[in-house]
Design a protein with these regions (language model features):
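C-terminal, well-structured catalytic/ligand-binding subdomain of enzymes
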Residues: 1-72, 87, 105-157, 161-402
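Conserved, charged/glycine-enriched, solvent-exposed linker/hinge segments
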Residues: 65-68, 72, 76-99
């Protein structure tokens, strides 16, 4: 068991130590791509990443402390690792759309907001984790997130204020822009600072208006849902920002997928996390490039403790959805180091995957009930213990059966 609570230096050292093989491999692949396909030297990459460094220095300087510790622990040069972070996504330094949706209000079985994203991208090892960075004077909000093992960008998340979000490619941008912060880091900034959909929208607007956001030649769909029961989709190109969908009672879809709306509407009024997981495996939703998926159930009363997320690391029809609560301090190392992702590359049957998920869900429901009881009597540490058994049990079941 490990904890991602601590100073940026501590968190960076731990991340770099655990995932050093993937970091070295992916940085090397990035440098070879730059050199062999784009004719760019290491010095040019470093120079082109200066704007990224400046934006991070302004918005979230603790990220630099974390990434420098990652580079040291992994044994890669700091400036090259920063260039990797700046240019890894959408080829920012080299001048697939995902699927996100949310259900709020009477659309869900118990009124708790639901959020989901299927991430379709290169099939790299994935991590699922809770992070709480301790920075004097800043107090970043703790969050659960999914992303690559080789960097700390956030692909989909939910934070302790009860805000869930994602940032997906949204078709061509007629006015490409490369000199800024990619959306995985914009989403991390939102995870650490925003409390609801309104604040998330204002941060997206600020980054766009000030030229801090760089989406290369693709526009972005930002999808958010919060504990208040609001869900929005924001279309963001470099010349246009518009809320394209908003709901306080019903569904929002960042994009239409064959069979998706119909599947969700079939269970409208009774939607559960299991329905979101099922929808992620629909033929019209599940892409060959699907490398991870996240379903979130936001607890509106105690989001910092009882909000739960389930992640499938790897293609969703071959991966188990593993649960994790925001109220934990520790989590299995296998959630972080690519082990769960590796399970998805084994020839396990859909029936076995369903069985593991069902067993884990029975234990999770019991553990959450015990945690709620403990919280009513002000036994927060007892509640945390019950919630931490959820990921432990799911990991043990996977190790036993997969």
């Amino acid at each position: 068991m490990i904890t991602l609570t601590g100073t940026p230096e501590h968190l960076g050292h731990l991340w770099g130590e655990i995932n050093h093989v993937d970091i070295v491999t992916h940085v090397d692949e990035f440098l070879k791509l730059a050199r062999n396909h784009h004719g760019l030297s290491e010095a040019t990459l470093i120079e082109r990443s200066r704007r990224y460094d400046e934006v991070v220095g302004e918005l979230a300087p603790h990220w630099h402390l974390e990434s420098e510790a990652i580079a040291r622990a992994a044994g890669v040069e700091r400036d090259l690792y920063h260039a990797f972070l700046a240019g890894k996504y959408r080829g920012l330094l080299f001048a697939g759309d995902c699927t996100s949706f949310a259900a709020v209000g009477s659309a869900t079985a118990d009124g708790r907001p639901l959020f989901h994203k299927n991430r379709d991208n290169r099939m790299r090892p994935q991590a699922f984790y809770r992070k709480a960075t301790e920075v004097f004077g800043l107090d970043p909000i703790p969050y659960l997130a999914v992303g690559d093992t080789s960097d700390t960008g956030v692909m989909m998340m939910v934070n302790a204020e009860g805000l869930a979000g994602s940032a997906d490619m949204a078709g061509p941008d007629a006015d490409p822009y490369y000199d800024g912060l990619m959306n995985p880091y914009g989403l991390r900034h939102i995870a650490e600072t925003a409390r609801d959909c309104g604040e998330a929208l204002e941060i997206v607007r600020m980054m766009n208006d000030r030229g801090l956001y760089a989406g290369a030649d693709s526009a972005t769909n930002w999808t958010f849902a919060d504990k208040h029961g609001t869900a929005i989709v924001i279309y963001n190109s470099h010349r246009r920002l518009q809320v394209t969908s908003r709901a306080c009672d019903g569904l929002v879809l960042a994009c239409e997928r064959e069979g998706l709306r119909e599947r969700l509407e079939t269970s409208l009024g009774d939607l559960t996390p299991a329905d979101c997981n099922d929808a992620s495996r629909l033929p019209g939703v599940l892409a060959t490039e699907n490398c991870s998926s996240l379903t979130v159930q936001i607890d509106p009363d105690q989001p910092e403790t009882l909000t739960c997320a389930w992640a499938a690391l790897g293609n969703a029809d071959r991966a188990v959805y593993f649960p994790l609560y925001l109220g934990v301090e520790t989590l299995p190392r296998a959630y972080l180091d690519g082990t769960l992702f590796a399970y998805s590359h084994r020839p396990d049957s859909a029936a076995l995957i369903a069985s593991v998920e069902a067993d884990s869900e029975l234990q999770r429901v019991h553990a959450e009930a015990e945690a709620r009881t403990a919280l009513t009597t002000n036994h927060a540490l007892v509640a945390r213990h019950h919630l931490e058994t959820v990921a432990q049990y799911a990991r043990a079941e996977a190790e036993k059966h997969l």
